[in-house]
Structures are given as structure tokens and as C-alpha cells.
Amino acid sequence: MAKKVDKVVKLQIPAGKANPAPPVGPALGQAGVNIMGFCKEFNARTQDQAGLIIPVEISVYEDRSFTFITKTPPAPVLLKKAAGIEKGSGEPNKAKVATVTKDQVREIANSKMQDLNAADEEAAMRIIEGTARSMGIVVE
């Protein structure tokens, strides 16, 4: 018989840098999870993606055991990395802060494909282009 899920905790944590300090500690402490066990497992699983923020969905079961799924980094994080900027524009419709190429957008769309609600690569690219536009990044 499958274990019954008690709680689902969603967090965004820098890859390889999970520690018991906030926000990880309090969120998992309330759910009754072994915080150090999670931190070690998460850091081991994400050490090759250093510098990126990784969304994680932790399923906590009634017996306080847990499993977690790491997702692909958020599109804005990948776009900022591709454009080489710290943050997007404060006024995206007026002030453009950077440019990215269609190839960079295609690469991001392919890496995000499993998490996007898109039927094909073209639709995924349009989603990423829309995100770029709302950040003040021009797509060439």
C-alpha cells in the first residue's frame, strides 16, 4: 500500500546551498521532516547546477518520511544568466536592459520543456520570449 501524503512543501533554494537556516528550516520543521537529511540529499542532487535557483517540491508522508522532486530553474533566472545581467528592467516597456538571441531562447525553452505547459518547442519559445519581454530583455 502506498504511503499517504500529509503535506506538500514548495521551496526555491539555491543549488547546492540548502541549510537549516530560513527559509528551509522553518518550512520543513513545521512539516516534521529531518531537515539535515533533506539538506544533504538536496545539495548532493543539485551540486552540478551551482549558481542557479532550483524549485523543489517536497512530499511529506504521515510517517514523516519524505521524497522530493527538483524542477528546472525559473525562466527569469535562466534569462538573466543568458543575458549576463543582475536583474530585469524596472520599466520593461520603456527601458530595455539586455538582448538575447533566438538560439539562447531555444536553448532555455528546451531545458524548461518538461515544466512548461507547451505542446512543442515553438510554443515553449513563445512563453520564454514573453517572459523576456516582461523583464525588459529584447529577443533578436
Swiss-Prot record:
Disulfide bonds: none annotated. It comes from the Bacteria. The keyword Plastid does not apply. One of its GO terms (molecular function) is structural constituent of ribosome. CDD domains: Ribosomal_L11. Coiled coil: none annotated. Gene3D superfamilies: Ribosomal protein L11, C-terminal domain, Ribosomal protein L11/L12, N-terminal domain. It holds the Pfam family Ribosomal_L11. One or more lysine residues are methylated. PROSITE patterns: RIBOSOMAL_L11 (PS00359). GO terms for cellular component: cytosolic large ribosomal subunit. Signal peptide: none annotated. Keywords: Methylation, Ribonucleoprotein, Ribosomal protein, RNA-binding, rRNA-binding. Forms part of the ribosomal stalk which helps the ribosome interact with GTP-bound translation factors. Part of the ribosomal stalk of the 50S ribosomal subunit. Interacts with L10 and the large rRNA to form the base of the stalk. L10 forms an elongated spine to which L12 dimers bind in a sequential fashion forming a multimeric L10(L12)X complex. This is Large ribosomal subunit protein uL11. It comes from Staphylococcus aureus (strain bovine RF122 / ET3-1).
